[in-house]
Each structure stands twice: as C-alpha cells, then as structure tokens.
Amino acid sequence: MLLEAVLLQLLVLATRASPVIFEDCGSAYDLFIVNIAGCGAAVPCYVTLGEQIPVNVMFYADFVSRQLDQDVTININYIHARTPVTPEPCETVMCPVQSDAITSFTSVMSVPTDMALNQRGYLQWRVYNEAGRQVLCYSVLVQTQNYLQKMMRQYVSEAHRKQLHRLGFYGL
C-alpha cells in the first residue's frame, strides 16, 4: 500500500515537474535529475514561504548505503535556515540502497515562514549514509515568495501562454 502511494506520487511529480538546474556540490553517487514541484528549468526556482514542496531525485549508486539521512538548508543573505524534510529516504526507498542501480526517492520540504521575502539564495540538499559519507549534495538557486505572489506569477504565466497560443505558437 505504501509502495503504491509512493509510486503514484512519483508519477504525479514526474508529469508535473521538469528537472531543475542544479549544481552538484560533491556527490559520491552520480546525481542525474532533481525535480522540485512548481519549478522547471527556469532560474530561479520560486519557493513559497510556508508551503510543503515535493522534491524528487534520481541517482546512480555504485556502492551500497544502508541508511540515508538528509540535511537541508536555504541560504539567503548569509542566514542558513534549516529546512525540515519528510520522510527520510529509507522510509520510501528500500534500504540498503543497491550498488550498480538507479535509485529515486521523493521527500517533502517545508519552506520556513520566517525567511526574508523576495530574496534570492540557495537551497542546499545534502544526504549522508550510515558512515557519514556525503552521497548526494546539490544546490539550486531559489527565490522566496508569498502565496499572493505565487498566484500572481501563475496568472501572468497563464496569460502569456494563452497570448502565445493565439499568435500561433503552440506547445510553449
């Protein structure tokens, strides 16, 4: 039952999100794809204060890890805000992580509400194994927004898409 729910969540995430531009910051595993719900290849990735945002990663593991722990921060104006994420990877992925296999997992990030608004910074996501080895590390350029700004961006984006469609630019 849990596996079916996770697979359904992955399917929804895969159809609604496109990979974001990320910088690998020292992953031991080969990180292929980072999907953040609501973000695509456009920079920055807008994150809404107080929202729960699904984040999916896909990577190739060339060695076994029995346990994975996440350390996630949003760094804005030299302030490093710890960002709660759930669940831990081994709650959704069969651990140990298999060697010579492509693995994917989804966690949900809670964006803190006490951060500066309309500021750019970096989301940094680190994953450590049971030996304390950093197996995944990436950072993504983000900009904070509130719910009203999110709704306005969606409205403008949809209006722009409709205008392009009327002009004969389909599929944009």
What are these regions (language model features)?
Residues 75-85, 131-134:
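Short aromatic-acidic-glycine turn motif
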Residues 132-165:
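Short beta-strand elements
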